[in-house]
């Protein structure tokens, strides 16, 4: 089992690593050989959208899930506190060999089309009446945290938006790993996506976390 990064953050401002975070880590470890074979001989661009505490991006760098030393890691989050936390977590775990850039942005709005080789997305998946507005002030900590949790109708407003853009985000041989909860109705979502885009979608792992059932799927052309 690969080591889990040490994380020390202000969890009033940044999403605390939980069962969903650890499921993604386990899935990336499970996919290690696949990713090594796919990207082991070339530089890869790896992007985590919604980096939060930075535990996933740091895990990728710390354990060389993408083996090339000079691979580029992008950590995107709309929450400025999350970007600081991601840098702190990488530094705390002595991740010095990989290039890491943090970007404050909404999803892929600051990323060039068809450049991302590996995308990881742990979205705000909790069903809610609506997606919260972006806070007007950096100091509104509770509201920043809500953005990491509340996903609108069926918890899918943000994930649906990303799925519609996936064709523009990934490189031709890229792969995306996206987390869903049972209330997102993932089987229905996957069927619609496959029917529309004719991509390959594979269930990597499902796990019961308290009363919630979480799953991670991979998406490739």
UniProtKB/Swiss-Prot annotation:
CDD domains: AdoMet_MTases. The keyword Nucleus applies. This is eRF1 methyltransferase catalytic subunit MTQ2. Disulfide bonds: none annotated. It comes from Saccharomyces cerevisiae (strain ATCC 204508 / S288c). S-adenosyl-L-methionine binds at residues 50-54, 77, 122. Present with 3390 molecules/cell in log phase SD medium. Keywords: Cytoplasm, Methyltransferase, Nucleus, S-adenosyl-L-methionine, Transferase. GO terms for molecular function: nucleic acid binding; protein methyltransferase activity; protein-(glutamine-N5) methyltransferase activity; S-adenosylmethionine-dependent methyltransferase activity. Methylates eRF1 on 'Gln-182' using S-adenosyl L-methionine as methyl donor. eRF1 needs to be complexed to eRF3 in its GTP-bound form to be efficiently methylated.
């Amino acid at each position: 089992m690969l080591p889990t990064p040490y994380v020390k953050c202000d969890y009033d401002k940044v999403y605390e690593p939980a069962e969903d975070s650890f499921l993604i880590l386990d899935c990336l470890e499970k996919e290690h050989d696949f990713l090594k074979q796919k990207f082991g001989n070339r530089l890869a661009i790896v992007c985590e959208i919604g980096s939060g505490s930075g535990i996933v991006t740091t895990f990728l760098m710390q354990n060389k899930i993408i083996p090339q030393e000079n691979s580029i890691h992008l950590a995107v989050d709309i929450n400025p506190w999350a970007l600081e936390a991601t840098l702190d977590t990488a530094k705390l775990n002595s991740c010095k060999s990989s290039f890491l850039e943090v970007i404050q942005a909404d999803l892929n709005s600051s990323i060039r089309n068809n450049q991302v080789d590996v995308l990881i997305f742990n979205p705000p998946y909790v069903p809610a009446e609506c997606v919260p507005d972006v806070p007007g002030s950096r100091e509104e900590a509770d509201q920043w945290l809500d953005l990491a949790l509340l996903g609108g109708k069926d918890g899918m407003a943000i994930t649906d938006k990303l799925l519609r853009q996936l064709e523009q985000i990934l490189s031709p041989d890229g792969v995306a790993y996206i987390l869903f909860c049972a209330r997102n109705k993932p089987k229905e979502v996957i069927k619609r996506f496959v029917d529309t885009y004719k991509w390959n979608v594979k269930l990597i792992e499902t796990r019961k976390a308290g009363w919630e059932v979480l799953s991670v799927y991979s998406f490739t052309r």
